[in-house]
A protein has these predicted regions:
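Core catalytic alpha/beta fold that binds nucleotide/phospho-ligands
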Residues: 1-195
Length: 195
C-alpha cells in the first residue's frame, strides 16, 4: 500500500510518497486514479525500474491531489506543469525524488514553486566546492547545512526556470538562521528565503 504524507507550508502543499511498490503495482494504482493513455508512450521509454517507480509515484501524487482530469506535461525547459481541458486554475507543481522518497509541491496558479530533497548528505559534502564559494562554506557549519544549501539551490533553480543559471556565483547563500536559508540571486536582483 502506498505511503502518503502531506505537509502544508503557507500556501504550498507538499505530498510525499515512500517507494515500496513495484512499477507494476504502481501502474495498476495509477490506472484507478486517471486515464493512463497519455502516459503510456513516455513510461515505455523509461528503462530503470527505480526511475519508473519515481515517475509513477509523482503522477499518483498529482492525481490524488488534483483528480483524474489532469495530465502532467513539460515545458521545453523540462519544468513540469499540469494541463487539463476541463479544469481551470490548476496549481503550479515541482517534483523531486531521492532514495526511496518522491515529493510533489503544489502552489496556487502563477505562483511558481521549486522543491528538492536529498537522501545522502555525504554526496553534497564531497562536491560542495562545485556549488558553494569559500565564503558560503564558512557560513555553513556542517554537512547537514551544506546539504540544506544544495537542496535550496536545486529548488531555486527549478523555481527560476532560467537555463544556465549557475549554482556557484549566481545563487549566493547569505545566512542560515532558525532553519531558514537566505539565498541571493544578484544577476536577477532577487532574494529567496528557503525553508
Amino acid at each position: 500500500m502506498p505511503h502518503f504524507r502531506d505537509l502544508i507550508l503557507d500556501n504550498v502543499h507538499v505530498s510525499f510518497w515512500r517507494l515500496e511498490e513495484s512499477a507494476d503495482e504502481m501502474w495498476t494504482l495509477l490506472s484507478t486514479m486517471a486515464d493512463c493513455a497519455p502516459y503510456r508512450e513516455r513510461f515505455s521509454q523509461i528503462g530503470a525500474e527505480k526511475r519508473r517507480r519515481e515517475w509513477l509515484a509523482a503522477r499518483c501524487l498529482v492525481h490524488k491531489r488534483c483528480g483524474a482530469a489532469v495530465e502532467v506535461r513539460y515545458h521545453d525547459s523540462g519544468r513540469p506543469y499540469l494541463w487539463s481541458e476541463e479544469v481551470k486554475d490548476l496549481p503550479e507543481i515541482s517534483v523531486t525524488h531521492s532514495g526511496d522518497c518522491v515529493a510533489v509541491a503544489f502552489s496556487p496558479r502563477n505562483y511558481r514553486v521549486g522543491i528538492d530533497l536529498e537522501a545522502d548528505e555525504t554526496k553534497a559534502w564531497r562536491v560542495r566546492d562545485r556549488f558553494l564559494s569559500a565564503r558560503e562554506q564558512r557560513l555553513l557549519p556542517d554537512s547537514a547545512a551544506v546539504l540544506a544549501a544544495w537542496c535550496a539551490k536545486e529548488a531555486i533553480y527549478k523555481l527560476c526556470d532560467v537555463p544556465g543559471l549557475k549554482f556557484l556565483g549566481e545563487m549566493v547563500c547569505e545566512d542560515l538562521k532558525k532553519g531558514q536559508l537566505r539565498v541571493k540571486l544578484p544577476k536577477m536582483g532577487k532574494e529567496v528565503f528557503v525553508v
